[in-house]
């Protein structure tokens, strides 16, 4: 039952993100996004900065990610980032080529389990090899 609620919440955020970013326009890089959208903010000129595992906000890429990555306890670029922050042992990268960072999980199997519930099977291969 919890997975049904989670799936419904993910669909709601993804739909909301698609409509908000379409109305905002590509040049402004504002609005709600999902790291699972391709490209995440409607254009590859903007970056989706997660505030949760499946929802974030669009920003210009000029140094925003570096500061946000250091401040956010679950954003990571490597397993070492997760261990340093105390947020887990595995950095599960989003199965999206436009997202250059990941989310900290306790283990690789936990990341695979989460991503398998919300992404198409062909995208899951990139999580397993990251």
Swiss-Prot record:
List UniProt keywords, sorted A-Z.
Disulfide bond, Knottin, Seed storage protein, Signal, Storage protein, Toxin
Q: How is it modified after translation?
A: The C-terminal glycine may be removed from PA1b.
Please describe the organ and tissue distribution of this protein's expression: Major component of both the cotyledons and embryonic axes of mature seeds.
**Residues of the signal peptide:** 1-26
Is the keyword Signal assigned to this protein? yes
Extract the GO molecular function terms from the UniProt entry.
Answer: nutrient reservoir activity; toxin activity
Q: State the disulfide connectivity.
A: 29-46, 33-48, 41-58
Extract the coiled-coil ranges from the record: none
- Proregion span(s): 64-69, 123-130
* Entry text on domains: The presence of a 'disulfide through disulfide knot' structurally defines this protein as a knottin.
Official protein name in the record = Albumin-1 A
């Amino acid at each position: 039952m919890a997975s049904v609620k989670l799936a419904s919440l993910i669909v709601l955020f993804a739909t909301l993100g698609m409509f908000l970013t379409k109305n905002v326009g590509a040049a402004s890089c504002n609005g709600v996004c999902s790291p699972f959208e391709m490209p995440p903010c409607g254009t590859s000129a903007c970056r989706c900065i997660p505030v949760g595992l499946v929802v974030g906000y669009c920003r210009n890429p000029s140094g925003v990610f570096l500061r946000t990555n250091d401040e956010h306890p679950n954003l990571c670029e490597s397993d070492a980032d997760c261990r340093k922050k105390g947020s887990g042992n595995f950095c599960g990268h989003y199965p999206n080529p436009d997202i250059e960072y990941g989310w900290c999980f306790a283990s690789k199997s936990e990341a695979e389990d989460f991503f398998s519930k919300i992404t198409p099977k062909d995208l899951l291969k990139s999580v397993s090899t990251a």
